[in-house]
Structure formats: C-alpha cells, structure tokens
Amino acid sequence: MWIKNGYRLAKKKKNNNYLFSKERNEKFDVIKNEFYKNKLLTDYLNIKGYKSFQSGKWWLGSWEEGKFDGGMTHGDFARQGRHGDEGLKIGREGLNPIFDFIDQTQEDGDPFFVWYAPFLPHTPHDPPQELLDKYIKLAPSEPVAKYWAMCEWFDKTVGDLMNYLKEKSLDENTLIIY
C-alpha cells in the first residue's frame, strides 16, 4: 500500500476484484469490530424510543449492524457492497425510502432519526441537465461544472427533505444537522 496525496492506493490484483474479495472483507471486519465495541448514536436513540433509518454512505457494514431499525445498505463485499451499496441510490433516485420511513413512524407515533448521507456529489458526475446548463459557462472546465451541479443537486435533495418535513408539520420539532 502507498499513500499519495491523502489517498490509499492498494496494490492491484490480477483479477482487480480486491475491493469485493473475501480477503478484504476479513480485514475490514477487524475495523468494524473495533468500532462496534462502542455505543452508537442509535443505541442512545433506541433507549429513548426513536426509530432510525440509514440511507446513503455507510462504511460500517449493514444498517442492521449499525443498529438502525431500517435502511438501505447491506454492506456485503461479496455482493459488491461498498460505502453504502443500495443506500447510494438515495437522492439520485429520489427520497421515497426516507419519506416512507417517516410516514410509518408518524403512523406508529414514534420519534425518528434519519441518516441521510447521499453519495452526491461523488462520481459518477451525472447531474440533471438543467443543473449542468447552469454551471457549464461559469466553470473553468466541464468536469468542474458537473461537480458544481452535483453539489447543487445534493443541496436540492436536502431542501426536498426539509419541504417534506414542513408538509407533514414536522419541521418545528425536528433537529437537522447538516
């Protein structure tokens, strides 16, 4: 392994599947096991009756391991799970899993916690065309324009979530940490 400019560069394997290999999974388990020796935010929230939902980036295995009540990330390297796998669709493909979770907690009368950590603005940089058009003439290059558009897309999804909370009259009694 080499460190260059703050990035870890793993030696390439012949089949280039190291990221999803059993070997990497076993090494990563050591890190996860150390992390999970500690109490988690979800532990404290569960004690107070909160229901919690994970979406987006989650580098520590599955949502179940994080003691969430629901979620999107399976975290299984053998199934190409990495950094959030299914959870990475959140934001890019809408917010319906989060909205459904919030609706269910309200139906059940439970307080809720949502982990919303979309992979926006990470690659692939494929913003909606209207956002790209906004930045293409302002940016020094197309890749920079795409990145800026992705950042705005991320902000837009946060706004969509906040608007949803307002529509449900939950905005006055909800803490948002951004």
Give a label for each model feature.
Residues 1-178:
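Formylglycine-dependent sulfatase
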